[in-house]
């Protein structure tokens, strides 16, 4: 069994639950499609799978 006892899963970093509604927090990669999320940096969003980089304005 991996991880520390009592640690929360990373899935909570990707979704937000408001009552009965679930919404995505992180941006989905436009090249890879659903299921691939982009990491957030200070000045850009980057996909770890395909390497797509979108710079923030």
Swiss-Prot record:
GO molecular function: structural constituent of ribosome; zinc ion binding
Alphabetical list of SUPFAM superfamilies matching this protein: Zn-binding ribosomal proteins
GO cellular component: ribonucleoprotein complex; ribosome
A Pfam family the protein falls into: Ribosomal_S27
Keyword Cell membrane: no
Entry-linked Gene3D superfamilies: 6.20.50.180
NCBIfam families, alphabetized: PRK00432.1
Subunit and partners: Part of the 30S ribosomal subunit.
Name listed for the protein in its UniProt record: Small ribosomal subunit protein eS31
């Amino acid at each position: 069994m991996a991880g520390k006892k009592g640690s929360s899963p990373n899935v909570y970093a990707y979704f937000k639950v408001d009552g009965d509604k679930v919404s995505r927090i992180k941006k989905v990669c436009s090249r890879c499609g659903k299921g691939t999320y982009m990491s957030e940096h200070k000045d850009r969003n980057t996909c770890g799978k395909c390497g797509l980089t979108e710079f923030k304005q």
